[in-house]
Amino acid sequence: MSISIKDKKEELLCRLTDFTKLKGUGCKVPQAELLSLLDGIGEGIGYDCSISQTKFPDIVMIQTTDFFFPLVDDPYFQGKIACANVLSDLYSFGIEDCDNMLMLLACSTDMTAEQRQWSSKLMIQGFNDQAICAGSKVSGGQTVKNPWPIVGGVATSILKTNEFIKPVNAVPGDVLVLTKPLGTQVCVNFHQWLSKPERWEKINTITNAEECEQVFNYATLSMARLNRVGARLMKKYNAHAATDVTGFGILGHSTNLAQNQLLPIRFEIHTLPIIKHMKKLEDHLNHPFKLLKGTSAETSGGLLISMSRENAEAFCKEIYEIEKQPAWIIGDVIDQSSNYDRSKNTSIILENPKIIEVEPNTNF
C-alpha cells in the first residue's frame, strides 16, 4: 500500500491541535487508574479485542473500538491515522480482514462553521479512504458536537474460531518482534514546539526546523501505516501472541500481554528502536516523556509479537521485503515456572537497553 503526504494547494484553514490539549493515544486514562476503574468488571483490561460467541457453531465476532483527539494538524491524515489505529487491535489477533467499520466523530464547537465543515469533512474522507485501503468499508457511525474534535470508530470481523490468534500462547524461548519504531508521540509534541517560541528555544541548540519536519513527516506516515501485512505474516510464521503498542507505551502493553499468557513467563525487552533524534531531545530535557522507560504513549504503533526466533527472523526479513520498513527483535520470553504463579507474569525493560535510532524512511 502506498501512503503519501497530500500535496496542499492551499493552507490549512486551522490547526487541529489548537483545539485540544490531549493528543492521540496520549488521551488514554493511565493504566493503573484504568485497572482500578475496571475492578470487578470482566477480566480487567483484558485483550485488545472482545471475543463474542455467535448463535452459529464455531463462529465468533471479534470487535474493537478506539477514538482520540487530534495529534496532527492535517485533518485528512488525522482520519487515516485514526482508522489505522482502530484496525490495529484486529491485526494483533492475526486478523487480516475487517468485515465492517463504524466511524465515531465529534465536530468542534470551538471552530468557526467554515473550519468545522472543512476539518470534519476531511477527517471523514481520510478515515474512509484508509478503511478502503484495508479492504473494509464504513457502514455507519455517530457524529456529535464537542469542544475538542474526536475521531475513531469500531472494527468488526466475523470468523471461525480457528481463524485468529488468541494472544495467550507465548512460550519460553520465544522472542519479541516490534513492527514500528517508538517515539511517535514525542515526535508530534516536539513538532508542535516549532510554533511555540518559548518551547522551541529549549531545543533549538540541538535540532532545527528541517530536521524536526523530516522526522514528523516520517512519524505521520508511520502512524497512518496499516499493520495489515504484519497480521498476515503472524499467521504464516505461527505467532503465539501479540498486541499493538499505543497509549500505555511499550512497557504498559507488553506487561498487559504478559499477564494474559497461559504459562508463567516474563518478557525481557533488551532493545528499543526509536525514531531518530528523539533520544537526544529526551536526554536534553531530562526525559519528560519517559520514552526510554517504555511508558511514553504511542499512537497507532506497531505490533508486538511473540514467536520462535527462527520464525521471527524470517518474519522481519519478509515484512521488509514487502513494505520496505524494518521490524526488530527487541526481547525474549523467559521461563518463570519456578514461581508457579501466572499472576506474576510481567514485562521489564533491561537496564541500559540497546537503542536503535531509526532513520526517517518515507518510502511507504
From Swiss-Prot:
It catalyses: hydrogenselenide + ATP + H2O = selenophosphate + AMP + phosphate + 2 H(+). Binds 1 Mg(2+) ion per monomer. Disulfide bonds: none annotated. GO terms for molecular function: ATP binding; metal ion binding; selenide, water dikinase activity. One of its GO terms (cellular component) is cytoplasm. The gene is selD. Mg(2+) binds at residues 48, 89, 244. Belongs to the selenophosphate synthase 1 family. Class II subfamily. It comes from Dictyostelium discoideum (Social amoeba). The record marks 28 as: Important for catalytic activity. Its cofactor is Mg(2+). This is Selenide, water dikinase. The keyword Transmembrane does not apply. Keywords: ATP-binding, Kinase, Magnesium, Metal-binding, Nucleotide-binding, Selenium, Selenocysteine, Transferase. The lineage of its organism: Eukaryota, Amoebozoa, Evosea, Eumycetozoa, Dictyostelia. Synthesizes selenophosphate from selenide and ATP. Homodimer. ATP binds at residues 28, 46-48, 66, 89, 141-143. Its EC number is 2.7.9.3.
